């Protein structure tokens, strides 16, 4: 496996290198941040990098509205031949709800929950509602690990 240094996915200026799939949410850049705005009654929307990665570590910061559900799709695909192009695959959950499963693994549009945080109280308490949070995702081989804050 060839090691490559850190690569900046977002340039802080515009959405070059990114494409929206499914749904009608609006994505824009404000003050060097990607801002997504939900559209009522729209199917799930996904902002996807145009690059593909096999083994990777992804680190980012996020802040999510307490009324929304979100996540970070990894190892996911969108093909017009499968589910009419719906993005599907692993999602690292961003869950501001009372159950607090941020960092759990959900199989979007397929099998559902693969790893909840139901039995992991320290992980459930790591997410800070209404604040910026940091997430680290390691996807190496067939292992996916996540950390919050």
Give short role names for the model-derived ranges.
Residues 1-149:
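Carbohydrate-interacting regions of secretory-pathway proteins
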């Amino acid at each position: 496996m060839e090691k490559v240094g850190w690569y900046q996915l977002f340039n802080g200026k515009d959405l070059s290198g990114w494409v929206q799939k499914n749904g009608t949410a609006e994505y824009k850049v404000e003050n060097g941040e990607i801002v997504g705005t939900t559209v009522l009654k729209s199917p799930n929307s996904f902002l996807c990098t145009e690059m593909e990665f096999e083994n990777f570590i992804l680190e980012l910061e996020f802040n999510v509205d307490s009324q929304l559900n979100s996540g970070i799709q990894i190892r996911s695909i969108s093909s017009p031949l499968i589910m009419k192009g719906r993005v599907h695959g692993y999602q690292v959950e961003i869950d501001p709800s009372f159950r607090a499963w941020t960092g759990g693994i959900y199989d979007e549009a397929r099998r559902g929950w693969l790893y909840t945080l139901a039995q992991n109280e320290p992980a459930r308490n790591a997410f800070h509602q209404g604040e910026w949070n940091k997430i680290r995702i390691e996807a190496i081989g067939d292992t996916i690990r996540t950390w919050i804050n």
